[in-house]
């Protein structure tokens, strides 16, 4: 049995380190049942649960409230709500603002619940000229714009010794999100790049830089960190961002005015996406 092919098969289900542990268990099985054993484990490992992460409590509060068969579970510093939304088993969590909080929460969620997919929902600032307040951005991929190891020959945004400059979202999730967006009214849906940094962007100069340097569609503070951890664990992910401001000098005022509306739209969209 050639295990390299099994690694390729199992990559969407669990990482290579975990895969090597499973090989220790199945290596003495007859060849005829080895692949079936891997497939059975993979299904159990992934389950049918979708993890939903928001940076702020207000981004997930309504979803928590709407959960059926609700169960609250604490894992370390994180309070998860497990239940059903639109008939789909989900687990929700507030990560906290910023990349470190987002990454830590994502790993905690994966370790505790082994989700089939991860959705990061919330609000963002528009970077692309065609995207405006209350529109939806579906992530094609995500990168960390404030990662700078250019002195060592890496492109701006590249994490040293990582394979990816940008972390690509899962194609089937993208396709479904675009279809759901097309079916809903009141906003336009775009596919594009999410750029993440520990900074609230509120200057035209910074906005233009992100657009030209990274071909960014929107900017926010958590998505690429969630994407990185999901990818390391072999969990398909998608970032959904409703636009709360246009990342310019008016951004603080615009954000305050439109945040609630953008979050309400996000809740409605997630409920449709889960159906």
Regions found by a protein language model. Name each.
Residues 21-28, 41-48:
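Short, Lys/Arg-enriched N-terminal segments with co-localized hydrophobic residues
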Residues 7-9, 16-22, 35, 40:
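Polybasic, lysine-rich low-complexity intrinsically disordered segments
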Residues 247-275:
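His/Asp/Glu-rich mid-to-C-terminal helical/loop segments that flank catalytic regions of hydrolases
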Residues 200-246:
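A C-terminal functional module that forms or caps the active site or interfaces directly
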């Amino acid at each position: 049995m050639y295990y390299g092919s099994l690694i390729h098969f199992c990559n969407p289900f669990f990482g290579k380190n975990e895969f090597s542990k499973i090989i220790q268990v199945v290596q003495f099985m007859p060849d005829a049942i080895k692949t079936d054993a891997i497939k059975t484990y993979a299904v159990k490992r992934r389950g049918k649960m979708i993890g939903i992460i928001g940076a702020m409590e207000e981004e997930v509060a309504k979803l928590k409230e709407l959960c059926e068969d609700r169960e609250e579970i604490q894992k370390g510093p994180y309070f998860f709500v497990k239940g059903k939304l639109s008939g789909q088993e989900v687990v929700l969590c507030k990560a906290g603002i910023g990349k470190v909080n987002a990454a830590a929460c994502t790993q905690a969620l994966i370790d505790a619940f082994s989700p089939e997919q991860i959705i990061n929902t919330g609000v963002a600032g528009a970077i692309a000229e065609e995207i405006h307040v209350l529109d939806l951005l579906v992530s094609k991929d995500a990168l960390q714009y404030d990662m700078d190891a250019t002195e060592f020959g890496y492109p701006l945004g590249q994490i040293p010794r990582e394979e990816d400059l940008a972390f690509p979202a899962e194609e089937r999730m993208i396709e479904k999100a675009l279809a759901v967006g097309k079916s809903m009214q009141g906003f336009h849906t775009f596919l594009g790049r999410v750029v993440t940094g520990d900074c609230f962007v509120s200057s035209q100069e910074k906005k233009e830089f992100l657009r030209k340097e990274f071909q960014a569609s929107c900017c926010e503070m958590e998505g690429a960190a969630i994407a990185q951890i999901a990818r390391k664990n072999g969990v398909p992910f998608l970032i959904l961002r409703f636009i709360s401001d246009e990342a310019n000098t008016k951004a603080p005022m615009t954000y305050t005015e439109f945040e609630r509306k953008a979050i309400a739209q996000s809740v409605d969209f997630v409920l449709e996406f889960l159906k």
